[in-house]
UniProtKB/Swiss-Prot annotation:
The keyword Heme does not apply. It is found in: Secreted. One of its GO terms (cellular component) is extracellular space. It catalyses: (3R)-hydroxybutanoate dimer + H2O = 2 (R)-3-hydroxybutanoate + H(+). Pathway: Lipid metabolism; butanoate metabolism. InterPro entries: OHBut_olig_hydro_put (IPR016582). Pfam families: 3HBOH. This is D-(-)-3-hydroxybutyrate oligomer hydrolase. Keywords: Hydrolase, Secreted, Signal.
Length: 706
């Protein structure tokens, strides 16, 4: 077996076999039908590294609780970071990207490396020793190269075996779930099965033809070959022509792989579990009679497997459970899942006087609607919007453009803004999201929508879909303000450790190629007549791909149809937790209809509970932004509890909670500073909720406690 050595204190799978050969030879095995452990055919070479839990570790890369809460770790040579330095940066940035790393917000008290599996606050740094295995899953072409990783903590006990899946959230790389499913699994002595699900830090610098390889290092695309995380499908002549027409641009894997990986997120998640079983049985299985292979000691019959993660990773976990024909998954516990359902008018969801019929909207549909309306809606209450960075003058022009296109009503800007916000609420956003719309437009909406337009339609980077491209842009005070420029060499070199997989990231921005006068940073670009309106033409083009009849729209909707889920969890116990104020993946389009359709599809076999948390939203990391901490509580606290409850159910048969609304208490302010979080702000999920907090299903109607 080919082995790539990665990191320090390394060993190989074949050496593991040799190490236990003598023991295996002593006992023998008279069973003529040995169940041998075999490497899945889709797995490439396996890189293995062991970490001592002091100088380096699985959870914090040696940084510990203090280091994760501090400044980014230094790189000796920013132009030539080592694989170990890139790994450390990736763990640092991915951990912090999904959690609030502030003491007042709960880091170090409610959660964090120093808080043990029982929730006890310790004085330690929370470093976890163990072994890490990394490999590609691929079909042999090198075009898929789905990164798989298994972390096995030193505390893993094969007599008490458990595996937790940690498919990455967003478009993140393989360490994307380190702070969610990863931390919970490692603390509880479980192996953690991660995958980047075909997204991740695959950044192809088309001008210089460099890419990331599996360990994050950047190199020439030709030299990387099949070890590249992602290389755009362009011939040399196509790349030269593209560079001549649009220099200094980038292709990014999730957007430009032309494979619509979301359709296979369940498959990749199941493969990560199979990889985990392979690794564990190589490590703990007895030797077969041939003296070379190992037997399958750990199987679904003696191992608890929880499909988990958050956001896109949560959606992948649900998809995996739906597709699990081998019984690999024991139960599901996820937070804020990105999940899409086929239209079904049998279902209704009722909250107070509001009733929505059907299964919500597909992701690309509601993102393109938000991309049109959010900047105008931000003007309803600009002084009270959380972390509002929307430019008022540009947003005013967007309101005017929406009115001209018949998308809002009103004669004044205030009336048009109110109309835009009302349209968002009517579509399904909860009123609790109103003050969060501005921040989501600034930091998420266009970037996510554009990525999904490209991936669903399987567009190439050379298509410049809707006139958009990805490039670094000049600073406002530079000689080329907001125009495409060469990217920072150090930012590219360290991209594996810092990128989230969705531009804007590591200084690579979204560019409007069609801006009047030449390509510019999209937010600063000029529409007809030199007007700045957040590129209304680009927003309308993206919307047409969701609702129109063009050839490109047909391509996008075909891709959208490939990612719908069935809501059939095959009778597995499952918990979904989601924040009521989720503005990225609104509950009306995700958790609520999924719960209802699961009840319709599975009937009395359903074992899914849906937990909706008030004063919680999608990005716990946003709790560090102005306007967020006094209003919102960390959803992560409830993810941890859901995992604890699912594990207890699978281990001891403990009852799972009924579906419910958990009513939290905002922290509020003392002066201008958010109060420290206390246990009273985040009451626990109850096994049996009060009648006024119940979420119920009857006669195809989900009723949400108001």
């Amino acid at each position: 077996m080919t082995i790539i050595i990665a990191g320090k204190n390394t060993l190989t799978l074949t050496s593991l076999a040799a190490a236990v050969l003598a023991l295996g030879a002593c006992g023998g095995n008279s069973d003529p039908f040995e169940s041998k452990n075999t490497k899945p055919a889709y797995l490439g070479a396996v890189a293995i590294a062991s970490y001592d839990g002091a100088s380096d570790d699985l959870l914090t890369a040696g940084l510990g609780k203090t280091g994760l809460g501090g400044t980014a770790p230094a790189v000796a040579d920013p132009l030539k970071p080592t694989p170990a330095e890139l790994r450390r940066l990736a763990i640092f940035n991915n951990y912090r990207a999904i959690l609030d790393i502030s003491t007042n917000g709960g880091y170090g008290t409610l959660y964090g490396p120093n808080v043990d599996a029982k929730g006890v606050i310790t004085t330690g740094e929370g470093k976890i020793a163990g072994t890490e295995y990394i490999a590609y899953s691929d079909d042999g072409t090198g075009r898929q190269n789905i990164t798989m990783m298994v972390q096995v903590p030193a505390s893993f006990n094969p007599a008490n075996a458990c595996i937790v899946t940690g498919t990455s959230s967003g478009s993140r790389g393989v360490y994307g779930a380190i702070g969610s499913a990863g931390e919970w699994g490692l603390k509880n002595g479980c192996a953690v099965a991660y995958t980047d699900k075909g997204t991740g830090t695959g950044i192809h610098d088309l001008q210089n033809n460099t890419v990331n390889v599996q360990n994050g290092v950047r190199t020439d695309a030709a030299a990387a070959g099949k070890n590249s995380i992602f290389t755009a499908e362009l011939s040399a002549s196509e790349r030269a022509a593209f560079n001549a027409a649009t220099p200094n641009r980038f292709a990014v894997k999730h957007a430009h792989s032309q494979q619509n990986p979301e359709k296979d997120w369940g498959k990749w998640t199941l493969q990560s579990v199979e990889f985990a079983y392979f690794v564990l049985n190589e490590k703990y299985g007895d030797l077969a009679r041939d003296g070379a292979t190992h037997l399958k000691k750990l199987t679904p019959s003696n191992t608890i497997v929880i499909a988990s993660s958050v956001s896109n990773g949560a959606g992948a976990a649900l998809a995996a459970a739906e597709q699990d024909t081998q019984g690999l998954i024991s139960g599901v516990a996820v937070a804020e899942p990105e999940v899409q359902l086929a239209p079904d008018a049998r279902l209704s969801v009722k909250r107070g006087a509001s009733v929505l019929v059907g299964t919500g909207k597909p992701l690309y549909d509601y993102f393109t609607l938000a991309n049109l309306l959010q900047p105008c809606a931000a003007l309803v209450s600009p002084a009270t919007n959380a972390f509002n960075t929307v430019n008022a003058a540009t947003a005013t022009n967007r309101c005017s453009a929406l009115k001209a296109n018949g998308l809002v009503t009103g004669t004044t800007t205030a009336e048009q803004a109110a109309s835009a916000l009302a349209a968002l609420v009517a579509a399904g956003w909860q009123p609790e999201s109103n003050v969060l719309q501005a921040s989501h437009y600034s930091f998420a909406t266009l970037s996510v929508g554009l990525t999904y337009a490209n991936t669903y339609g399987r567009f190439s980077v050379k298509d410049n879909l809707c006139g958009f491209s990805f490039a670094a842009t000049g600073a406002a005070a530079s000689a080329t303000p907001n125009a495409p420029v060469p990217a920072s060499a150090s930012a590219l070199a360290t991209s594996f450790g810092a990128s989230n997989g969705v531009p804007p990231t590591i200084g690579i921005n979204i560019v409007n190629n069609l801006s009047a006068g030449g390509p510019l940073l999209d937010a600063a670009s000029l529409s007809a007549g030199g007007v700045q309106d957040y590129n209304i033409a680009g927003a309308l083009c993206m919307r047409e791909l969701a609702t129109g009849s063009s050839a490109n729209a047909v391509r996008v909707r075909q891709g959208m149809s490939e990612v719908v889920r069935s809501a059939n969890l095959r009778g597995k116990p499952a918990l979904i937790v989601q924040g009521r104020a989720d503005t990225l993946l609104p509950v009306a389009f995700t958790g609520r209809p999924y719960y209802g359709m699961n009840k319709i599809v599975e009937g009395t076999a359903s074992r899914l509970s849906y937990i909706e948390v008030t004063n919680a939203q999608h990005f716990d990391a946003f709790l560090a932004f102005p306007g967020y901490p006094e209003r919102m509580v960390p959803l992560h606290r409830y993810f941890i509890q859901a995992m604890d409850m699912m594990y207890a159910n699978l281990k001891t048969g403990a009852a799972l909670p009924a579906s419910q609304v958990v009513r939290t208490v905002p922290r509020g302010l003392t002066g201008a500073v958010a109060n420290p979080i206390a246990a009273s702000n985040v009451p626990p999920i109850k096994t049996t909720p009060a009648a006024a907090d119940q979420i119920t299903f009857a006669n195809n109607v989900v009723t949400i406690a108001d």
